[in-house]
Amino acid sequence: MSFQPLDPDFENKIKESFSRQGFMDFIGAEITDIRPGYCEIQVPYKKELSQQHGYFHAGIIGTLADNSGGYAAFTLMPADSSILTVEYKLNLMAPGDGELLISRAQVIKPGRTLTICRPEVLLSRTGFRPCVQLH
């Protein structure tokens, strides 16, 4: 699906907003790809982000899905807008066992006040495999 951003400077708007999220900095997350209707965020594994079995904590997985979806939607919004999450449901399909967590989100239905996105969260250890489904 091809989208036209309402803000020609959407990439800088996203990067500036992301830089104000202290938690993203704290966990070591980086935006690695931004396009109209799409955002990818990665975070490398570190012990401080793990749960009791040494896997990525589900809270970190959900955070990346939430942020990538929000920023995918934000790419299509006017310059003077802001964004907040309304709802998501997280189904964990596999443990967060990997060296790198990657969330790729795509807008599936843009709207004036509500935009629906589909994040896909992947883990990398020896290749990429999905670990979560969002609804």
Residue ranges and their predicted role:
Residues T32-I34, M93, I108:
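Short beta-strand micro-motifs enriched in acidic
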Residues M1-Q42:
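Non-catalytic linker/capping segments at the edges of enzyme domains
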Residues V43-P44, R104:
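Short, well-ordered beta-strand segments in beta-rich or mixed alpha/beta enzyme
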Residues Y45-K46, S50-L64:
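A conserved, well-ordered hydrophobic junction motif at loop->secondary-structure transitions
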Residues G59-A79:
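Active-site helix/loop of acyl-thioester processing domains in fatty-acid/polyketide metabolism
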Residues F26, P36-Y38, F56, D66-S68, ...:
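Short connector loops at helix/strand junctions that flank enzyme active sites
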Residues F3-D9, A79, P95-R104, I108-H135:
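HotDog/MaoC-like acyl-thioester-processing domains
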